[in-house]
Amino acid sequence: MRIPILTERLTIRKLERQDAERLFRYRSNPSVNRFQFWEPASIEEVQSFIEGTGGVAKENFGAWRQFGLFLRASDQLMGDCGYRSLAEDLSQAEIAVTVAPEFQGQGFGDEAVRALLGLLFREEGKRRVFASVDPENTAAVALFKRVGMRVEAHFVESLWFKGRWADDLIFGLLAREYKGKN
């Protein structure tokens, strides 16, 4: 796997222990974690998260591989993205992206997801990539549409999430569709 990945404005690379404080700061922000399953309670928890995801072996299917999104100009951590291969079907992967509030709305999420799709389809040989999104997360819905993913399913009140039943939108993209667009 080719990590780090360089895009026009980002370096996508493994998270390290020294990134924990910055990751904790934006991941514990209510505007960010409103739609996140993981809400870190401490910097120590974030350090454990980094140790548990950044170095996950490729063969550990089902586990998330998480990477930091760093501004190329300053090496500042401004978000993270990740994927996990499905244990029951290794040709598929789920993706996710988080961008710190001060960097949202500037196309960084698009840039990161496009790079992640390239990695998964071109280098990892995935057949299908998908994302699970709360339909109330309108920014994520718009992002996945912009990068060429389509809504494959809308599950109504299918997830118990933060004290309520939430809907779940599944966005998907096949390798042949990706190759036709890129």
Question: PLM features: residue spans?
Answer:
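GNAT-family acyltransferases
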Residues: M1-E102, L119, E123, S158, ...
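Conserved acetyl-CoA-binding loop of GNAT-fold acetyltransferases
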Residues: K145-F155
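Conserved acetyl-CoA-binding loop-helix of GNAT-fold acetyltransferases
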Residues: G105-L119, T138-R146
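Conserved GNAT acetyl-CoA-binding A-motif
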Residues: E123-S132
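Short amphipathic helical patch at the helix-1/turn junction of helix-turn-helix
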Residues: V99, D134-P135
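Short, Lys/Arg-enriched C-terminal cap helix and immediately downstream tail that follows
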Residues: R128, V156-E157
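Conserved G/P- and acidic residue-centered "switch" motifs that form tight phosphate/ATP-binding loops
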Residues: D75, G107, N137, G163
